[in-house]
Amino acid sequence: LSTLLLSGEKAMDEDAGNEHIVVVPRLGTISSWSSKATDIAHACGLEEIDRIERGICFSYLAPMDLNNELFNQIKMAIHDRMTESVLDKDFDLQNLFLQQQPEKLNEIELVTQGKQALEIANSELGLALSDDEIDYLCNHYERMQRNPTDAELMMFAQANSEHCRHKIFNADWVIDGKPQSEKLFSMIKSTTEASPKGVISAYSDNAAVIEGFEIDRLMSSTADREFVFTKEPTHIVMKVETHNHPTAISPFAGAATGAGGEIRDEGATGLGAKPKAGLTGFSVSHLRIPDYPQPWESDFSHPDRMASPLEIMTDGPIGSAAFNNEFGRPNLLGYFRTYESSLPDLPVNEIRGYHKPIMIAGGVGNVRDQHALKIDVPEDAEIIVIGGPAMLIGLGGGAASSLDSGSSSEDLDFASVQRGNPEMERRAQEVIDRCTSLGDKNPILLIHDIGAGGLSNAIPEAVDHSKHGALLELREVDNAEPGMSPMGIWCNEAQERYVLVINKERRQEFITICERER
């Protein structure tokens, strides 16, 4: 273990300063570095290790005791408050690895306390429920004569959020007193309806598919375990989405997981596809580069809880590129623009800009002809989650991204940001590739990626498609945090995970593929 951890550049002399500050990943979270390092240790045979975590010890010379103001300035300069914690001098490092007992399912006392209990839960859990939705839930549970659980409310909030339902784009519009026949989404879809030639699927799967070409595909042969070229029709997968809220809170992690989520959407198209190349785009407010003022930049205020435009453009593109590179997909193109302007002609002077940025992640891939479309799922099929473990990160991300910026607490904002582990996503993609290489014997009957809302969104999507019910065992979900409540397991947005449905008879065959790819 010492050889593994002490390789590379040596640390400076610990006695170089008379004061020390230790910075670690934010308490209560598991960093992606920790997940990777622990996994590498296990792969090297060090099975006794439960978890490895990394911190940085900063040494500095201080001629006198620093007052709190100066000490806080030093702390702010050396750590990212959204992703890291500064430890007190008397902090016991063993507490980094404390494992809590599993939390219980909580009920919201709607029966005894009425609507107010739901309004409090809406605020405390960051559910972003509207007044109409709160009234709807109150009436629903009153008819059932029982209290809602926190897992049910969080699930409803994610699945019914603007992020997942696109309520604005699906809303009816009245312009100048005249109801409009088209909705925004139907207007977007009308182009495909008017020109359907070459479109295999659009607006019905995790990504769109258009007709491709006959090409040589390099795939592994299960029989002799050799890679062979096979000439066959191969179609083009296309996807673009945004990841704005997480990028505003933590630019590197937000942009990285934005790219990772788009990659998973491509891989989870049809019965399994292969991501090939990516794009990234950013729209932010003016950069205000220190000591490099520009005539069009005014000193407008900026929300403290959000990263500055300069921080976003310093860390965000690197986060996206890093995930693409570590996954093994080139990020080939993108765009970048700034915009911020005063609108003095309005009754109240307004300033418009991208304090909450636009972060676009997109890409193209390919899919075999026989796997381009989803199929019907038989009864008694098994639902399986593959990829990384459940972790208490990204909780409530779908609802958080639907809130007006600044209307939730800083802790809720942070909780809604995911953390990326591209190596794990690569492994999961290798499982998909091995399955699709089997052609007509592909064991995958249905596949969805796990994104906003976690399992609470992805599994109901799969169950709804199957037209059957499902029996779920939450405690059997791979979980890195044993203290997580049922709501946490059901709704967390830990990354690099997919929901698959496979034939029960082929379970062991599928597990063998997963074990080979670790």
Task: Please annotate each region the language model reported.
Residues 492-494:
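A structural signal for short secondary-structure junctions
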Residues 1-406, 410-424, 428-442, 451-455, ...:
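Core nucleic-acid recognition elements
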Residues 497-498:
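Conserved beta-strand-centric core segments of catalytic alpha/beta enzyme folds
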Residues 465-486:
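Anionic-ligand anchoring segments at beta-strand to alpha-helix junctions in alpha/beta enzyme folds, i.e.
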